[in-house]
Amino acid sequence: MEDQYVNEQGQKLLEKLKREGILPSPYNFANYKAPSLDEYIVHDSTLREGEQTPGVIFSIDDKLKIARKLDAVGVPQIEAGFPAASEKQRKCVEALVDMNLDAQLSAFARAKKEDIDVVADSGADGIVLSLSISPYHREYKFKGMSKETYLETLEEHISYAESYGLYIIYSAEDTTRENDLDFLKKAYKTAEEAGADRARVVDTLGCASPNGMAYLVKEIGKELEIPIEVHCHNDLGLALANSLASVEAGASTVSTSVNGLGERAGIAMTEEIIPALHMLYGTSIFEMNQLTSLSNLVQEISGIRMPPHKPLTGDNVNAHSSGIHQHGVLVNPTTYEFYPPRMMGQKRKIYIDELGGRHGIIYVAKELGIEISDETARKVLEKVKASFSSGERRSSYTPDEIKQLIDEIEKC
């Protein structure tokens, strides 16, 4: 049936995913064309963008812990910080360089020679050279900078960074609000000709749509030989969708942060982009079973807690509360799980509350090492439902509480 709309390339990927126990919608692979992804497919910015989250300040030791975990996941490129911002930032980047991680380290800089000098002196492999491009920034932040002056400034500073032998990522802040497409193309081409190794398209205010990002990436890509990276903010809740639309349009790298930490609503989440790239495009370079613990580590260090229903790494993502769902998933997990929980370093959870059923209670008992009859399970369920109906209870039963109910019933 699938061969009616899934082409040969899509069939191969779908079969590969099925062998891994991943059963996504086959319609994902209709007219499938594999995107051109870079060796630096994920460029994690937790240590730079993430620290711009209001109230979040990482110590040097915090950053080393996060970087070590990112490296264990297999993230190929880490944006280590903004070394020109302070002495502490500089020392942190230097300490990260001294770790000799497998990941390539980049550091952020403005289009200022003194910023570029600090990045070069830090020992970082690469530089994210930022120069805001939209008319709002050129008019108000740069006091009426003309397009001609912008291009001259850009060429001068890319060339200066290139003289240090740095891997250069030109980051055009507020790309998506520059309404002169010809000027945008000219800026990226100028950066490429001056020595940039990658072009970063930036949705600084998270105001673009997937269609808008895809169009922009395609148009800019027509002019360039160098790869494109996208940095998508989440103000409209579209950072993940915009990033994936950009990948399908030709972007080869996605800028992310763990738990989406960053300015305002943050950016695309590392722990969501990685499994999405795997389950939609077959990217297999990451240790995905480390992603839940990565998310938990950054929650602990940052103090920013994620909701339990957070996709892929939340506490409830592999939890089943409804009796209908519990029965289905216990008969065959594929009924209500399209990927195995272990893939994300998680375990299946069965919650017992007023929506639960006998099969869930039997499962919880078995997990406790107790074999119970259907009749005992039915009586436990009656007690559970009665406690919710009376208003006595408003939270799920823990396994220990279920054991206590079983003991009470079996004593009778």
What do these predicted ranges mean?
Residues 2-113, 352, 356, 364:
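N-terminal capping/small domains of soluble enzymes
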Residues 2-46, 281-412:
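A mid-to-C-terminal "edge-of-domain" accessory segment
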